[in-house]
């Protein structure tokens, strides 16, 4: 119809890790473009970050998504990390529990540090007792269930003090693998209203 003017056309791909499937989709999309371009020359927008690996030079735009975070391709490096600070250091004795529901019970005297981030900030709760952070360049293990606004780490035999910097997160793939979800879910669940994201 001459009353319809195409300003643009776009598509999305459902399995960009599979070249055969994706190339078939690209060819179908190109067929539609050839029909439309007989009358119009629309803006052509195609797929997301991984489309840079395909022959799509007929498109005007590619939507960069997760690649902006430094993920999706092996040649990219993560550009984001989350840092916090130690807000409290205290000792517990053998048999004492840490956090809700007896999520961790000490088998010896231990020194514990509190970090003021929790699942409200996007740390998956099923990482409880199953991830490490860096304090003063040393890896320390989380203990107990992650709380809404806090988590705890074992800093026994570590010389640290309140205010020391904590690197909580610098690679979404590590967390995603541990809890069997995608790095997309880790990244989009981070709560930037409470968390300052540091971009290298």
Give the label of every model feature segment.
Residues 1-93, 157:
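Active-site loop/helix belt of alpha/beta enzymes
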Residues 91-200:
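C-terminal accessory subdomain/extension
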């Amino acid at each position: 119809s001459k009353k319809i003017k195409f300003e643009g056309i776009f598509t999305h791909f459902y399995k960009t890790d599979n070249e055969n499937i994706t190339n078939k989709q690209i060819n179908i999309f190109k067929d539609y473009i050839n029909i439309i371009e007989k009358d119009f020359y629309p803006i052509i927008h195609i797929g997301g970050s991984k489309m840079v690996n395909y022959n799509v030079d007929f498109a005007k735009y590619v939507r960069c998504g997760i690649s902006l975070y430094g993920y999706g391709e092996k040649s990219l490096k993560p550009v984001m990390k989350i840092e916090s600070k130690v807000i409290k250091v205290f000792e517990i004795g053998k048999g004492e529990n840490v956090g809700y529901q007896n999520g961790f019970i000490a088998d010896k005297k231990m020194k514990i540090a509190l970090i003021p981030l929790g699942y409200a900030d996007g740390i998956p709760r099923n990482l409880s007792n199953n991830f490490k952070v860096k304090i003063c360049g040393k890896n320390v293990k989380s203990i107990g269930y992650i709380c809404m606004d806090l988590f705890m780490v074992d800093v026994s035999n570590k010389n640290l003090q309140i205010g020391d910097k904590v690197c909580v997160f610098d690679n979404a793939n590590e967390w995603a693998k541990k809890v069997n979800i995608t790095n997309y879910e880790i990244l989009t669940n981070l709560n930037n209203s409470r968390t300052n994201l540091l971009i290298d």
